Regions:
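Bacterial N-terminal signal peptides that target proteins for export
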Residues: 1-8
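C-terminal capping alpha-helices of c-type cytochrome domains
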Residues: 87-105, 114-142
Length: 146
């Protein structure tokens, strides 16, 4: 099974077990839980080395998925204004997560959007956006997907 299908399957299994009522009162805590656990954003957006996640590059993108006919490169989703999502509005970040659309209207491309992310509640989506805004910005320019 290729990496993209494995990531999608993992996200599907986690979302299927997602408790509807178990939401922390703190949106930032909820966002952290969703980004780091349930949605598994770091599985694609944190670059990996032989020993696992590369230190200091959490959510900074650059991981490559060569799955012909696509070559997907995970984007930097830290709030860095030059190489990440720091200049995006909250609505643009939410649209990218839910619909896979960039601020300029282009499709992000495989594997985003995960079809499952379309069903995220507005509150959970806002919590994810708030959390992504709170992580340390990491300057890490990545290549475009092909």
């Amino acid at each position: 099974m290729n990496d993209i299908k494995m990531a999608a399957l993992g996200a599907l299994m986690l979302l299927a077990a997602w408790p509807a009522q178990a939401q922390p009162a703190d949106p930032l805590a909820r966002g952290r839980y969703l980004v780091e656990s349930i949605a598994g954003c770091g599985n694609c957006h944190t670059p990996k080395g032989p020993q696992g996640d590369l230190p200091g590059l959490a959510l900074a993108g650059g991981q490559v998925f060569d799955e012909p006919p696509f070559r997907a490169v995970a984007s930097n989703i830290t709030p860095d204004p030059e190489t990440g999502i720091g200049r995006w509005t909250d609505a643009q970040i939410a649209r990218a997560i839910r619909e896979g659309i960039r601020p300029d209207g282009r499709i992000i491309g495989p594997p985003m959007p995960f079809e499952l992310y379309r069903g995220i509640s507005d509150n959970d989506l806002a919590a994810m956006v708030a959390y992504l805004r709170s992580v340390p910005p990491v300057r890490n320019a990545v290549a475009a997907s092909e």
